[in-house]
Amino acid sequence: MHCTITEHFIRHYPEKLNYSGNSDKDELGNGIIIKIRLKELPKGDRKAIFEIPDALKIETGVYHFPEDFNALDLFRKREYYNVYADESGDSPYIEAEIMLHQEYGEEKVRNMLLGLPLNLYNAAESEVYLLYDGARFAWIANGEIVNINFPFGSLKAENGDIYISDSAEIGICRNIKSLESEEKTETKNESIAFYSARGYNTWGGDIVNFYHDGVYHFLVLLDRHHHGNRFGCGAHSTYHMTTRDFIHWENYGEIYPIQNSWESFGTGTMFFWNGKYYYSHGFHTDRVIPRDKVGSRLLEKNYEREGFFSAVTYDELKENGLYPSGANYMVSDDGIHFVQGKKQIHCSENPSIYKDENGGLVMYAGYGAAGVWKAPDIDGPWKKEDTDMPVFDNSSPVRNSSECPSIFEWNGYKYIIMGFRGYWQSGFNDNDFKDLAVVGDDIYDGLCVPMVANCGGRYILAGWVGGSGWAFITLHRELVQHEGGRLGIRWMPELTPNPDELDKIAEVKKVASGEELKLDGKTSYYLECRVKPQKNGRVGLAVSGSGKPFVFELNTERQKVQTLETDNINSFTEEVKALYEYIPEMPEKRTSCAQIPSENIHTNSHDFAIANVRELKDEYTLKIIFHYEKKSDNLVMDAEIGAGRTFVSNRPDFKVGNIKFLTKNAEITDLKLCKMGE
């Protein structure tokens, strides 16, 4: 299986600009590019190499791992300096910090940081460039933006001279409008499985998927620093991928790059309506702008007066001193090149819009609003049809959020998936929805905020793996439907490894309890075997290596699958509760997900259990990928059980070295272990 991903990216040419050794500090607000070439990599403590007093500072130094890791603040941990430490644990760095003056908020001046690991981008061998243009604060290396944050506020240089160290060659350019760039492409032999966008610290967050005219569209919130950008407010844009066969993919990059300091995308849906493609999305503007200054306030007043929502143009919002927020949309003729509608149509910040049976549109309003809304046109009028579904927060026994509703119908049954935990199914050809998450009969498997697309009769689910903070790598699944509409979930055949095409390193006809296999922690592996359990059978894989060991267990009697850290790899661990089993322990008065009395739930994608795994009752095939994620230097274990359930566990700070098989009243046969490569 030869998988490819063709990535579109922007190549910048800062080397063509003219640089000098000084700058007018009063023109900082217009932007600046700083060229830096170190005379040698730093070897000691933190040292300033450039400073504009009270505005911008650039420093270099060396972090020593693992000693320094716990002392780092959260943002620096998410720069992944430790991943690029050398054999002695040293990770030289360069960090830039700007001082932003803000109109809103309690803190009138806030410092924003952005760094680079110099073992990855050696600024002593070639120049790196620091860009600030008001909306972007970025490092450029080899012509690409390789790290970025998004400022909110402005720079104001105070009195004092600019400092330039003699340990680096530094040039300054204020003419950032002359920065040339062009679109380039690169094709990689890579699968979409475990994908996380181009860049050493880029991750995929909430997703949108859609299928039309033989093309599958995959839209993902582009993340750096696990929601840490713009002081923890995210500042996400959306990248867009397509495929016709799920094997060969094209990543077109950002649909719309962040251009204003208030912009941060929330997902909605993509749909084809009246001959055009639409991407409905949210703007989380009030993360940085006071609520009385965002467009939703005007739309709410209009709704109170008129009883419906209608579109308000960005120009009208600006005339009222307001910023766009809530639900917005983009439109395209070809499904690839989108332009802004430049209208706010609703207050929902996760507007899931679909075509309805009458040719109009229906919105399942997520985050910022609630209920089901219908309109004859994208611009409205949007009238509320239903206030009961989907439920969230205080109304939900599992405390699911209202994020990213995904609605689909299959053979007369309707389904709603919402946020990290919400899951409902209707009866046959009716709208009598039952909450299946409260009985543990959902399809959550460690993927976060999943959405589903009907791909010509195949129902494809996608989401991101939790456990590393907000956003990480993304995965695809295929749903299977059973009697009564019950759903199962499996790997996509197109993305499932074929052991005959891989390097087999072990084949065992019958696996004895206690038998072990050795693995290399910086390599990915595929394991496949048959399991024949008795009614009270248990099978476990005790996984050890670099970091805390854990046991992956499949319990036929309890019909549960779980992972749990352990100090004893010679035995099964204690039972882990599935999410629904915590409901009786939660307070009667519902408030938030913080009431769940354990971190060992599927929303954290680490140690958790899934229930009602009916595939365990009979003989089944177990498939596991031990994926080594280079960008975070850790293991992600992904399993398919009996072609009907899946389970993904992220193991931060862990690399596999050994697998010990545990069996009780069960047999493991026909095992194959294959190397998939680094």
What does each of the following model-derived ranges do?
Residues F50-I52:
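Glycine-rich, compositionally biased intrinsically disordered regions
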Residues C3-E27, G31-I32, R37-P42, A48, ...:
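Carbohydrate-active catalytic/glycan-binding domains of CAZyme proteins
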